[in-house]
Amino acid sequence: MTTPLLLRAARGESVERPPIWLMRQAGRYMKVYRDLRDRYPSFRQRSEIPELAIEISLQPFRAFAPDGVILFSDILTPLPGIGIPFDIVESKGPIIDPPIRTLEQVQHLHPLEPEAACPFIRPILATLRQEVGDRAAVLGFAGAPWTLAAYAIEGKSSKDYIQIKTMAYREPDLLHKFLNHLATAIADYLCYQIDCGAQVVQLFDSWAGQLSRQDYDTFAFPYQKQVIQQVKAVYPDVPIILYINGSAAIVDRMAATGVDIVSLDWTVDLGTIRQQFPPSVGLQGNLDPVILFAPQPVLKERSLAIIEAGRKGKYIFNLGHGVLQGTPEENVAFLFDWVKSLA
C-alpha cells in the first residue's frame, strides 16, 4: 500500500502536486448532508453514532475525492468526558450550562479516559481508514485549550469573550489551572485518535486570534505547546497542524509551538510567511472561503496564486476557514479538480 499524498506532503517529502482538503468539507453546503440532517436533527447523534459520522465524513470523499478525509465531529466532543456536559442547538451553536467559573468547578473535573468517554471514535476512524485506503489520509482533530476554555467559561459562542478575559485578568491562577487540565485531556484525546487510525491531527484554536500578543503568550501559546509536546512524546512521527482564526499578529509564534504545519487564515500573505518560516515548518491554506462564491476564473486565479507561493516548501492547500453554508457545490468540485490538475 502506498503512502497517501497528504501524509507524504505533511512529512516534507517531495510530492507531485499540492494535496487538497477543506476545513468543513462535510457539512451544510452539501445537499446529501442536509438530507441526512433532516432525518437526524441532533448534531450529537450525527457526530456520535458511528454509522452517521462515517457516512457524513465520506460524503465529500465520494463527491470530490479530497486528499484528506477528516473525522466528522466537534471540538467539544471530549468535554463530557472530563465532567463538562454540552449540547449543540441548531442555529444557536454549543450551550454549556452551567458554565465553568469557579475553583470548585475546576477541582471537580476529572481526567479524560477517551475509550470510555468517546467509544464511538474508534469505529469511526477505523472504518474511515478502511474505506479510503491509500487514496486519502485520515485526519483527526481537537480544540485547543484556550478555545475550549472560552466555550466552557462563556457557556456559549461569544463575540467579545468578556467572561474568560475577565477571569484571565482577575483570577489568572484559576484560568491557568483550568487550561492545564484541558491541555492534558486534549493531548490524551489526540493520542487516542491516532491510536484509532488518524494519520494526521489538527489542533483548532479558533478563538486565540481574539487575544493580544501578550495574552496569547500567557494563556494560549504555552498550552498549545503542552498539547503538542505530549502528543509528540508518544507519536513523534505523526504530523500535527495548528489552526488559529485571525492569526496575523501572532503567526510567527505559531511555528514556535513545535507543530509540523501552520494553517493560515486568508488575512495572512502566505508567500511572506513562507519566507519567514524555516523549511521544517509546513504551511496550510489559505483561500478566503467566500471566493468559492466567485466565478470560476476568479477562483482559479486566486487559488493558483496561493499555490505558487505555498508549493515552494512543505505545503497543503486548504481554505483560510471552513466552507461556508450556501457555497455552490459545483465550485467546490471545480476547486478540487483544478488543484488536482496541477500534477
Swiss-Prot record:
Gene3D superfamilies in the cross-refs? 3.20.20.210
Any single GO CC term annotated in Swiss-Prot or TrEMBL for this entry: cytoplasm
Q: Which InterPro entries match?
A: UROD/MetE-like_sf, Uroporphyrinogen_deCO2ase_HemE, Uroporphyrinogen_deCOase
Catalyzed reactions per annotation: uroporphyrinogen III + 4 H(+) = coproporphyrinogen III + 4 CO2
Q: Give the EC number(s) listed in the UniProt record.
A: 4.1.1.37
Q: How does it assemble?
A: Homodimer.
Question: Could you identify this protein by its name?
Answer: Uroporphyrinogen decarboxylase
Source organism of this protein record: Thermosynechococcus vestitus (strain NIES-2133 / IAM M-273 / BP-1)
